[in-house]
């Protein structure tokens, strides 16, 4: 569901060839698989995948993932991986019923040792991940997250067209809900992705 260049990063500068700036990081919503493709050879040189054993276990269970990317150089958390873990249920023998969860989360982690650096979810916000958690933060499909220059994170909870900004402590400091539906007679709406862009990209707007 998502693919992007890694771009310049500290891991490659330190000699780790897996993170060559021209390599491509991808994710698969249907298999909950994160991987990096060597642009020259086509080989998979890094991955996080079911059944989430070894170092991957610290990140499990990841289900229905979207928007996996490396935080660009110059931003807080640069070099870490940021993704939207949608949650829900996933088909296949690699997933047990106990791994299903009706809540979403944003995960930031170090790609070298796969340790979790930051998370935003109903659980981290001290909200029960039951029915209350479902209402609090859950998008079982689409969605994305973006690290901002101020250290906050912009989150697109796409299934309900909710876009909001949270601090590293999880405080919501800005929120927008799109009023636009699929059609005049339908109240449901979705936002596939949402990004913050620099003011200079839209010079006609006032700061």
Predicted segment positions?
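Histidine-/acidic-rich catalytic cores in large beta-rich domains
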Residues: 1-207
């Amino acid at each position: 569901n998502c693919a992007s260049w890694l771009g310049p990063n500290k891991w490659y500068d330190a000699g780790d060839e897996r993170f060559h700036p021209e390599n491509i990081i991808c994710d698969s919503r249907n298999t909950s698989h994160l991987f990096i493709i060597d642009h020259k050879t086509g080989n998979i040189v890094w991955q996080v995948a079911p059944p989430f054993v070894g170092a991957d276990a610290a990140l499990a269970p990841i289900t229905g993932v979207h928007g996996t990317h490396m935080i660009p150089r110059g931003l807080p958390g640069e070099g870490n991986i940021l993704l939207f873990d949608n949650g829900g249920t996933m088909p296949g023998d690699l997933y047990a019923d106990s791994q299903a969860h009706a809540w979403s989360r944003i995960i930031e982690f170090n790609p070298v040792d796969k340790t979790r650096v930051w998370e935003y979810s109903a659980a981290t916000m001290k909200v029960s991940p039951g029915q209350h958690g479902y209402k609090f933060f859950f998008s079982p499909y689409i969605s994305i997250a973006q690290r901002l220059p101020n250290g906050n994170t912009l989150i697109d909870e796409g299934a309900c067209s909710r876009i909001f900004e949270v601090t590293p402590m999880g405080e919501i400091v800005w929120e927008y809900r799109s009023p636009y539906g699929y059609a005049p007679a339908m109240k449901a709406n979705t936002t596939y992705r949402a990004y913050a862009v620099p003011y200079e990209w839209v010079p006609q707007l006032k700061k």
